[in-house]
């Protein structure tokens, strides 16, 4: 009876009010989680540089996640089958071995109960060989995927987690002491239960830590992580009018956060056939694969490769892609015309010229265009110089404009990225445009200053995306240029060529100014007359 009375007395909220409360609760949880996590991570590193220590914190988080993920998956199945109170973590290893083959097929990996995070952590303080234990556990996890479809997703995943590094301590005992603190620190992070948390705790915490490490690392951080606000803008530009995407691709995927943004914007099952990316740096490549797992992307739903995208692209069999988003490295060197094979490469050949050896930016543009689906959109962050420089880059721009591939160019504010204050821009490309015009958007003032960087607010992003979708003239903000206008400007794609900046100088009223000057001159004359009178009186007295 009591529960019924409670139900009658309950005040029901509207959907909007309830959603608002849930969103506020999520934000509060997220903020609390972030503060606690950074405090733990910062305390754990001690005297070790945060940038060097990131692989240990992030790797330990991953170890905890896959342990809990596997445990909950098995426990849920057993409990649903009527085996109440079952706990895989307490199962003898020899009994668990019987389930290895089936679990590898379903989950892509297997961990023995004794090697689960919770059990290794429980024994860590008393394990004089903890470094060897962890090394063995990580090796076993990687080996468990061998021969399965998930092999490439797990191979070398823990390579950057060096348990014998002097960064952890000068002796085995000191290193193990640090490893115990690592396990306990990550174990104490309030990441909730994998099967029951109100925010995407593991993935959210991982991305927060990467943001903090990237911002503290400056230039090095910018090479592997695109700020969340820029990722949001790129992905929204690429998904205007769409509720689902076939495949998403990033040719310079870094830690993978930009790739994952499409799922956050469109929804969990909106990326039908998965996430594809390539990254040249092996440490960052490992961070990206871990990021996929922590966001609960199945091993059969992502394909991340570690190679030079321009010289050795790994996804020929997977292209074309409906959505391509990327923040490739700015103006790096590449082989260019030193490699005679590249001019005949189907990705670069159509332009008839290669990007300069000292500036590979246009090579990434051509690569992305080549692998773009006919119904797709590519949104690429670009160094501003490629929009106006002459030579080979101008010829490539001519090819892009003549063939009506450039849909929009957006000038971004300066100082949005970690480690560089450059005001970058975005080039949006499509293969089946509805018109032969190019939209130019000047978003240089669409930001707010946060500590040392500028940031795009949700309102800033909305305004840019809205202008992009409407393709209308907006004074001092957006201009829709036809082909003749662009070609007449020698294929210059700089936004400042097409969008006149607003004159923010104070307008001067000449009539009013002249009147003020006349008044000042008259007043000056009165003062002079008074001074002359005083001097004359002094002279008379003498």
Say what each PLM segment does.
Residues 43, 185, 189, 208, ...:
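Conserved, well-folded catalytic cores of nucleic-acid-processing
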Residues 6-7, 71, 118, 253, ...:
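Generic recognition of cysteine residues
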């Amino acid at each position: 009876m009591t529960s019924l009375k409670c139900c009658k007395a309950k005040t029901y909220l509207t959907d909007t009010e309830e959603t608002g409360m849930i969103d506020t609760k999520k934000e509060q949880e997220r903020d609390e989680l972030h503060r606690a996590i950074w405090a733990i991570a910062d305390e754990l590193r001690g005297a070790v540089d945060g940038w060097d220590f990131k692989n240990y914190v992030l790797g330990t988080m991953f170890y905890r996640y896959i342990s809990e993920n596997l445990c909950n998956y098995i426990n849920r199945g057993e409990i649903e089958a009527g085996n109440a109170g079952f706990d895989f973590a307490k199962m003898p290893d020899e009994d668990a071995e019987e389930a290895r083959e089936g679990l590898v097929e379903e989950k892509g990996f297997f961990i023995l109960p004794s090697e689960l995070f919770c059990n290794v952590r429980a024994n860590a303080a008393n394990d004089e060989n903890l470094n060897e234990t962890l090394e063995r556990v990580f090796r076993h996890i990687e080996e468990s995927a061998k021969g399965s479809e998930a092999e490439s997703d797990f191979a070398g995943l823990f390579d950057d987690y060096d348990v014998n590094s002097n960064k952890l301590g000068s002796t085995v005992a000191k290193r193990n002491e640090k490893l115990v603190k690592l396990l306990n620190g990550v174990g104490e992070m309030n990441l909730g239960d994998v099967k029951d948390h109100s925010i995407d705790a593991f993935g959210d915490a991982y991305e927060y830590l990467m943001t903090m490490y990237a911002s503290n690392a400056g230039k090095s951080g910018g090479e592997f992580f695109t700020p969340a606000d820029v990722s949001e803008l790129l992905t929204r530009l690429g998904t205007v009018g769409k509720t689902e995407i076939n495949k998403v691709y990033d040719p310079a995927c870094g830690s993978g956060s930009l790739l994952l943004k499409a799922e956050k914007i469109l929804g969990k099952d909106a990326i039908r056939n998965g996430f594809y990316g390539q990254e040249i740096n092996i440490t960052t490549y490992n961070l990206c694969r871990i990021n996929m797992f922590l966001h609960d992307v199945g091993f059969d739903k992502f394909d991340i490769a570690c190679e030079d995208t321009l010289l050795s692209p790994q996804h020929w069999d997977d292209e074309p892609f409906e959505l391509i988003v990327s923040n490739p490295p700015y103006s790096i060197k590449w082989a260019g015309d030193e490699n005679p094979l590249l001019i005949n490469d189907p990705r670069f050949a159509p332009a008839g010229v290669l990007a300069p050896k000292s500036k590979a930016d246009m090579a990434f543009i051509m690569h992305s265009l080549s692998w773009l689906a006919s119904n797709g959109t590519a949104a690429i962050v670009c160094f501003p110089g490629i929009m106006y420089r002459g030579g080979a880059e101008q010829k490539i721009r001519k090819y892009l404009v003549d063939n009506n591939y450039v849909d929009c160019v957006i000038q971004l504010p300066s100082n949005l990225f970690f480690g560089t204050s450059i005001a970058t821009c975005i080039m949006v490309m499509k293969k089946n445009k509805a018109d032969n015009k190019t939209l130019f958007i000047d978003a240089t003032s669409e930001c707010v200053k946060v500590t040392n960087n500028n940031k795009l607010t949700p309102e800033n992003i909305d305004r840019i995306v809205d202008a992009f979708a409407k393709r209308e003239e907006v004074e001092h903000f957006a201009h829709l240029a036809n082909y003749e206008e662009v070609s007449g400007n020698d294929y210059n794609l700089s936004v400042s060529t097409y969008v006149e900046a607003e004159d923010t100088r104070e307008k001067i009223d000449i009539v009013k100014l002249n009147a003020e000057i006349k008044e000042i001159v008259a007043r000056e004359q009165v003062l002079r007359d008074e001074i002359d009178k005083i001097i004359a009186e002094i002279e008379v007295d003498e």
